[in-house]
A protein has these predicted regions:
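N-terminal membrane-targeting hydrophobic helices
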Residues: 1-305
Length: 305
């Protein structure tokens, strides 16, 4: 799984919207789309202890990304179903497309760990994984071993990559970008929040996901390599050892699910990403007429009711 990368993705998607969608796609929808997969599945992955008993998934990796399990929450199919629900409910293209882009970013990023995601569900329940780093969520290790493994492997580089992408598009974090591109795409939500927050507060809220990601990355990396004193193979270490080799780190048990050959995963993920943007770009104009008709129909019903 990825950690701070999912926070940075939100701004990367916002900064690289198709030209016709700039200033018209909801930032909140991108955020909720990227947030949804782990919101639905991750709590039971780590579970919790109560009166000395652990409650959670017996096979966290199976529950999180597999089938049967909540692996469906990390499929493009599920994201599309959510988008259809949003469209049927509100006929709001800013939210429908924003959710689709955020959700897709999460699902496609998660092909990197040794479990991956079921990209072709429901046509196939095989996982698609690049095995870039080891998936490390376990019943005994919990989130601490998971974090230590991630921030000692190429997972750290994944977070760093997305951080660089956002910093390379630094204008997405500026007040001017927020005023001219973010607020106009979702005026009602920002206006509603403005009842309690002034402009500085609203801007801080917009930037908060990015700064949370930065703090999360720094804090967990510091804990894993400065604070922690793990016992590995009977040897006490001052911090978890770094291992930036493929499929690392070496000191974590490498788990996987039935999967396709890793050689086709990256090309397939890039093709699917291209398809998502192509479809979003293609239906964008048509959705506008659908929104206008839906609003007109709601007004008619309201007036006649």
């Amino acid at each position: 799984m990825s950690w701070a990368a999912h926070q940075f993705e939100v701004y990367a998607v916002e900064a690289h919207l198709p030209k016709k969608m700039v200033g018209q796609v909801s930032w909140f929808a991108i955020f909720f789309g990227d947030f949804t997969p782990d919101f639905l599945a991750k709590f039971w992955v780590y579970g919790f202890n109560f009166h000395g008993k652990h409650y959670g998934a017996t096979k966290p990796y199976q529950w999180h990304r597999g089938w049967p399990g909540m692996g469906i929450s990390h499929t493009l199919f599920f994201g599309i179903m959510c988008c259809l629900g949003i469209w049927a409910w509100k006929h709001n293209r800013a939210w429908t497309i924003g959710f689709l882009l955020g959700f897709s970013a999460h699902v496609l990023t998660d092909v990197n760990d040794s479990i991956g995601t079921m990209l072709l569900f429901p046509f196939s329940t095989l996982n698609w994984s690049l095995h870039t780093w080891a998936y490390a969520a376990t019943v005994k290790g919990g989130k601490y071993l998971d974090a230590a493994s991630y921030y000692s492997s190429l997972g750290f580089m994944m977070d760093f990559f997305w951080l660089v992408v956002v910093l390379g598009s630094w204008r997405v974090l500026t007040r001017d970008f927020w005023r001219t591109k973010v607020v106009p795409a979702d005026p009602h939500v920002w206006s509603w929040l403005g009842q309690w927050l002034d402009e500085r507060g609203l801007l801080a809220l917009y930037r908060s996901v990015f700064f949370y990601g930065v703090c999360r990355m720094i804090a967990w990396t510091t804990w894993a390599h400065v604070v922690a004193r793990p016992m590995i193979n009977g040897v006490r270490h001052h911090g978890y050892p770094w291992d930036l080799s493929w499929t690392g780190p070496w000191w974590v048990h490498h788990v996987s699910l039935p999967h396709v050959t890793p050689l086709i995963v990256l090309p397939a993920a890039l093709v699917l990403l291209g398809c998502v943007y192509f479809v979003a770009n293609t239906i964008w104009e048509r959705m506008e007429s659908g929104s206008i008709k839906a609003i007109a129909w709601r007004n008619v019903r309201r007036n006649t009711g």
